[in-house]
Structure formats: C-alpha cells, structure tokens
C-alpha cells in the first residue's frame, strides 16, 4: 500500500505598461494511493487539480482631456479537479496493461470591471465569463519488462489518452446600465496525449529512466457559437494553443 500527496506555492511577478505587480498563490497538487488486489492486479485512486486559475490585477487610469478617471480590474479564479480510478493487469509474465477512468468537474470564472467612480455620466462596465465542466476521460497504458540478466532489466512503456470534448455550461454576463446573461454553446476539448518511457534497473537497487509526452493542444478545438464579436475574439484571437512537449 502506497499513499502520497503534495502542495505547491507560487510567486509570480507581472510587468507591463510601466506597471509591476506581484501575485502569490498556493494550490493543492495531488492525493493518491496505490494497492494490490491480486498478485497480478493493482489499483490506484487519486484526486488532483487538472488546471487552476488565480489572478487579481488592477490598474488606475488617470483622467485625460477625453476620458475621466477610471479603474480597471481583471480577476480569474477556479479550476478543474480530477478524480481517477486506475487498474493494471499483468496479462503475461513480462507484459502489463492498464486503464484510468477520470471524472472532471469544476468552475472557472474570469471577470473584467471598468469603474468611473468620479463621473456620474459615465457607465461602469462589468463582464463575467463562467464555465462549469462535468465530464470524464479515459487513459490507456502498456508496459513490458525484459530481464537482461540476473541483476539487469529494462522496462519500456507507452500511454495514450484520446481527444475528448468536455461537457460544459458557458455563461457570459454583462452589466452596463442593465444586466444581461447568456448561456452559449461552447466547444472545449482535451487533446490527444501520447507518452513513451523506459527504465533500467540494476539489482533492484538502482533505477534510471526517462520519459517523453506530447499533448496535441494545437489540434484541440475551442470555440463558442455567438454573434458577440467580443466573445468570439476571446477564443479566436486572444489565445494561441501550442503542442506541449515534456521530457
């Protein structure tokens, strides 16, 4: 029986437009346990954050000849949680296969606020985007171990997670003189993930290994069905999604 967990502390410095800001954030990393059900069957259960958002940035705009004094703030919070159950089976002497079933849930909120505290004739503006996610995904893996001699062995493995569209509720709320709230049809996908790795073991006392993974974010789809140009721009122009490589 193996039990482990972890937490993270983040210190972030942001600069731009002559402004410098510091943000501190802490987050729960993971909680996992592993145990055997049978000499050929093992199981794992874990809870971990899949993504997190945490920022609060504000800026004061001094009055000019064309615009009054204003304050602008950007706030983001929330994230996705992942609960998984995995099982591995040794189907041959040297060959094992496994599968993880994960459940995702969580809310992510981002807001933009423009206030004109000293000018009654100027309307303040608030825009808030909330995404609620509740869905699942599957991961598959295979592992093969070859004994080279009595004290030397090599293990190779591969994992694959198929692309999956997340079930979500996407809501945009705006407030100027009145409040409007719209539920939109948004597409949020998790990418295909491929991974390979190997380890070398000497006499069960020394293990050396390496692994590589590829997350194909550039091929995942993100979009929203709306006639609001500002919302479409947030998806189509603000972000560039790149593949993620990890060694």
Regions picked out by a protein language model, each given a short descriptive name:
Residues 1, 33-37:
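Outer-membrane beta-barrel pore proteins
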Residues 1-13:
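Transmembrane beta-strand segments of Gram-negative outer membrane beta-barrel proteins
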Residues 14-20, 28, 36-247:
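Outer-membrane beta-barrel porins/channels
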Residues 23:
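Extracellular/lumenal carbohydrate-interaction signature centered on repeated Trp-anchored short motifs
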């Amino acid at each position: 029986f193996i039990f482990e967990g972890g937490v993270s502390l983040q210190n972030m410095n942001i600069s731009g437009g002559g402004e410098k800001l510091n943000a501190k954030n802490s987050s729960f990393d993971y909680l996992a346990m592993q145990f055997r059900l049978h000499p050929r069957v093992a199981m794992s259960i874990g809870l971990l954050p899949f993504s997190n958002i945490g920022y609060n940035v504000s800026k004061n705009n001094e009055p000019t000849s064309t615009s009054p004094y204003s304050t602008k703030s950007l706030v983001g919070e929330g994230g996705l949680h992942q609960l998984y159950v995995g099982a591995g089976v040794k189907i041959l002497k040297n060959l094992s296969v496994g599968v993880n079933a994960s459940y995702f849930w969580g809310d992510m909120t981002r807001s933009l606020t423009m206030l004109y505290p000293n000018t009654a004739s100027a309307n303040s503006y608030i825009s808030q985007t909330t995404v609620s996610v509740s869905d699942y995904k599957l991961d598959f893996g295979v592992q093969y171990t070859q004994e080279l001699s009595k004290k030397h062995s090599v293990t190779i493995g591969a994992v694959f997670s198929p692309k999956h569209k997340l079930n979500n509720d996407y809501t945009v709320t705006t407030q100027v003189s009145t409040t409007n709230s719209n539920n939109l049809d948004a597409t949020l996908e998790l990418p295909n993930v491929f991974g390979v790795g190997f380890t070398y073991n000497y006499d069960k006392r020394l293990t050396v290994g390496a692994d590589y993974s590829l997350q194909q974010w550039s091929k995942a789809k993100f979009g929203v069905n709306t006639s609001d140009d500002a919302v479409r721009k947030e998806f189509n122009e603000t972000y560039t999604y790149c593949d993620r490589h990890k060694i």
